[in-house]
Amino acid sequence: LTEEQKQEXREAFDLFDTDGSGTIDAKELKVXMXALGFEPKKEEIQKMISDIDKDGSGTIDFEEFLQMMTAKMGERDSREEIMKAFRLFDDDQTGKITFKNLKRVAKELGENLTDEEIQEMIDEADRDGDGEINEEEFFRIMKKTSLF
């Protein structure tokens, strides 16, 4: 993380840490989540804390918070990269990757794919059965194949 990103995370942490104890407990996390428009249940709050709480203290300290934020920022960056790739396929800007889009990209990359192979690729990623690949389907398949 850059110094600026660390500073942003420190400011966010300090906002959550309402009593200034240097840690975020379940009550503080619930208040902050509600302020952000979420309504997490008590179990969800406990799970969030246990997922982040590496030392088993039952609270989140700044180091643990920073590790979580670093991971989240990494996810955001890879999502942006995947969406850039999606837009390269979706050259007609329909919000979907069609058979025609995929065939064009394969040809540009010098891949000699048959129409059947292209259709198989679409079928593999197409979760809603509309015959095209939307952003979520593309994101999912890219994550699944670990290309990002």
UniProtKB/Swiss-Prot annotation:
This is Caltractin. One of its GO terms (biological process) is cell division. It comes from Spermatozopsis similis. Disulfide bonds: none annotated. The keyword Calcium applies. Ca(2+) 1 binds at residues 17, 19, 21, 23, 28. Ca(2+) 3 binds at residues 126, 128, 130, 132, 137. GO terms for molecular function: calcium ion binding. Belongs to the centrin family. GO terms for cellular component: myosin II complex. The keyword Calcium applies. Ubiquitous. This calcium-binding protein is found in the basal body complexes (the functional homolog of the centrosome in animal cell). In mitotic cells it is specifically associated with the poles of the mitotic spindles at the sites of the duplicated basal body complexes. It comes from the Eukaryota. Residues 4-39, 40-75, 77-112, 113-148 form the EF-hand domain. PANTHER family: EF-HAND SUPERFAMILY PROTEIN, MYOSIN LIGHT CHAIN 1, 3.
